[in-house]
Amino acid sequence: MFNVTKKSIEWGGETLTLETGKVARQADGSVIATLGETSVMANVTFAKAAKPGQDFFPLTVHYQERYYAAGKVPGGFFKREARPSEKETLTSRLIDRPIRPLFVDGFKNEVLLIVTVLSHDLVNEPDIVAMIAASAALTISGVPFMGPIGAARVGFAGGEYVLNPDVDDMQKLRENPEQRLDLVIAGTKDAVMMVESEAYELSEAEMLGAVKFGHEAMQPVIDMIIDFAEEAAHEPFDFSPPDYAALYAKVKSLGETQMRAAFAIREKQDRVNAIDAARAAIKAQLSEAELADENLGTAFKKLESSILRGDIINGGARIDGRDTKTVRPIISETSVLPRTHGSALFTRGETQALVVTTLGTGEDEQIIDALHGNSRSNFLLHYNFPPYSVGEVGRFGPPGRREIGHGKLAWRALQAVLPAATDFPYTIRVVSEITESNGSSSMASVCGGSLSMMDAGVPLKAPVAGVAMGLILEDDGKWAVLTDILGDEDHLGDMDFKVAGTENGITSLQMDIKVAGITPEIMEQALAQAKDGRMHILGEMSKALSSANSFSAYAPKIETLTIPTDKIREVIGSGGKVIREIVETSGAKVDINDDGVIKIASNDQAAIKKAYDMIWSIVAEPEEGQIYTGKVVKLVDFGAFVNFFGKRDGLVHVSQIANKRLTHPNEVLKEGQEVKVKLLGFDERGKVRLGMKMVDQETGQEIQPEKKEKEEAGEA
């Protein structure tokens, strides 16, 4: 009944297995990949014909994590998986980016790739396994896919590269100074296709070394998929790339001159309008059959690409007049919004980001529910890209995959320089509103985010800047690396290479490559140019702000104290009674962690002090010999019970009340009276012994021996 194909190798200290032929047999390609005890299933289906008139490649990738994979039940009212989490969205993009360029040019049939996590051992991250499963499923499906690809995760600990560090290592990346890198790489046997990384100020050489290490480490996986496909692959889909040479030749002859003139215009919107006019002029001269040709859009793109790329490769200027290494003009401003905690407006050429920072308390932290368990994040970065930023009318609504991905890239770039939570106990939310875009808006978010946080008073370890690099690589081997690319250079170029970091090193690197043939020499040149660009941008940013400002008057103030964990119950009280009383009485917010760290927040410093004192009176131990203010709560024949130091009671013996003989305490005291008492010690049962006669009841100071003797003599 089943025709099972199964292959296994030892890889990175674990067994990697690929299996097909038993599950999801009606899919065009189905593979279950297992690393350790983490199993991921990838299923590929594709349409056998393109939709009429379709001029793009409709590839859809869905990565989904099932809670049962880790033995968990989903939260929420319905107790089932719902909309994709941020992790699922980011992993979908991680799979999509390296495979999309490897489909044969001209293939426009719809392709659907669904990747599902079936089992998670809480050791091996499922994203790498998912990419391997997806690659294998595509390779055996028969779809015109020029893979396979491999994938690997690279860490950097103790000066050594580490293959596929486990979940715990990556979760503790920020707290562990030895573990300084989380890099995911995907590529074919001969070329790197995609890099995504989070780093802690690594040098360009260290980052390049990590890419080389990862590409070499994935080779056994690629060889395994090839061997696997030789036994399990379906018949290749009969597809021949469309021949549109005649159509392209006609488009070029009709409109190359006008199109070149359009690309010579330096302002983006004027250039876009001129390009649209050139296209319209060409279309006006084409026949109905040529206008209906689904390859017309491809012919236009080829013409535009040849103009932009040819001018750069042949030593001419870029479309905005710059050479290959120049960064566009930069203007940085801070404190642009009066009531926010921190704000910055970062403008680089025709790309602009308005970035706002808000400081919150512990209750504002984001709770992340993942397969490996719940966690909390005190740093949030949200990126918004409205249609008006590119002068268009378009969809407006919740953030899409692109916005989530760009926001996470900026998050990775900035989180490496955040102060430790123990030093800066705030939740930080950064929002980047892209108000203009002509390339590299995510890197503008990094620059604006750094300035905005410093404007809010966040003591960053160092300012961070980012720059997007591009590449033009021709078939004859000529190439050019471009600094600070425009939108058209990204669209028509061969590489999008984003690098962010401080003066000391790289904090984030993202690379997407559309062609094979990217050599280590090209990558080294791109990193060197990116460093020069980053240093220039940091210099321009420092003109606006070079270090953290003082706190905004509108930001909450936070103080922390640490109490013994066995005292947490006393501070909370039965059913939360005590903590509610503290909050209501003081007016401050109080957040208690399981480790005994308490954060007290308010805009009013007096409220913070009130809450602090109330908590301290509960958890602190009274010290022998110290003087405290108390209240008489009960009088008995042998003395007075006094409540002091919060909820504590002690006995003042009748002989310790006054410097004279008393027959009953009510001769000098009454219930409810405020008194000053000295803690004399503890009896054999641990009961508190207090004294009054050695304390001046007016000043609260201890009576000196000579004064005491005079008082006793006077009484005699």
From Swiss-Prot:
Cofactor: Mg(2+)
Domain S1 motif: 625-693
EC number: 2.7.7.8
Principal EC category: transferase
Gene Ontology CC: cytosol
The keyword RNA-binding appears for this protein: yes
Molecular function per GO: 3'-5'-RNA exonuclease activity; magnesium ion binding; polyribonucleotide nucleotidyltransferase activity; RNA binding
Protein's name in the database: Polyribonucleotide nucleotidyltransferase
